Amino acid sequence: MHDKPVALVTGANQGIGLQIAKELAAKNFTVLVGSRDLARGEEAARMVDGGARALQLDVTDQASIAAAAERVRNEFGRLDVLVNNAAITHTRRLPDQTVEEYAKSTRPSVVSLDEIRAVFETNVFGVVAVTQAMLSLLREAPAARIVNVSSGVGSLTRNSDPTCKLAPASRCRLRP
């Protein structure tokens, strides 16, 4: 039996997810660094003190999610904390682009439907799929927790801002 609590952080190979992984490791968790790209996950795991482990996990791929859940079950038998952090945005503002130009380029009326689907697959449906796959493992833990990471762009108030479009619409679905 594994003595330390086990935490899985999706999208932990960079940014906020990586920092969350570091913080959990500092609190004596065994941290699983969830990443679509295993090599990037392994690189990130080396940056986390406390022996974090990379876990290949594409939140938009049911087979990847199932394989990750099976690995957690086989190696640890439970999951104490699930941090749903993985998220994407479809576009970035170019350095020479004005706010007005950027707002026009990100309107749902001009963004391709494939891009919109990709954002929602990761930011909304990926959270649901990973949570569903990990629920039985979370139920094995004495005091399991699920943390859904959102951001200011997920604010319903900000989501009504006409200059703020697609990613906020997907992230506000995670707000309590």
Where are these regions (language model features)?
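Conserved residues in the N-terminal Rossmann fold of short-chain dehydrogenase/reductase
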Residues: L55-Q56, E121
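Conserved glycine-rich Rossmann-like NAD(P)H-binding loop of the short-chain dehydrogenase/reductase
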Residues: K27-E43
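The beta1-alpha1 cofactor-binding region of Rossmann-like NAD(H)/NADP(H)-dependent oxidoreductases
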Residues: L38, Q56-E70, L113, V127
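Canonical Rossmann dinucleotide-binding motif of NAD(H)/NADP(H)-dependent dehydrogenases/reductases
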Residues: M1-L32
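Catalytic loop of short-chain dehydrogenase/reductase
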Residues: A87-F120, R139-P176
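Hydrophobic positions on the long internal alpha-helix
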Residues: V83, V130-M134, L138
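N-terminal Rossmann-like NAD(P) cofactor-binding module of classical short-chain dehydrogenase/reductase
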Residues: L8, D80-V83, V147
